């Protein structure tokens, strides 16, 4: 399973980020052996995604699955959105969403916007 994440530079609520990952993990099928997080930034989102992957690695391994953090550019994620199974966008209230949110919805990717 491939999860795309992106957010705004002002977003700093790690608990909401964890909730977004819990929602994505709930879609992980039994036959899925990989959980890859493609993070399109900015840096604060990349750091949350990397921390989540590092902290979850042991638990995932015990379940016979692997987790991997991959930093990508927003352009790359937009161009390769069809490879993504789930997309999460994280922002504070009243902040605009990125173009990737619209592109992922147009491509019927399960898209969630978290703005708390």
Task: Give the residues covered by each predicted segment.
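Acidic/glycine-enriched connector segments
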Residues: 10-116
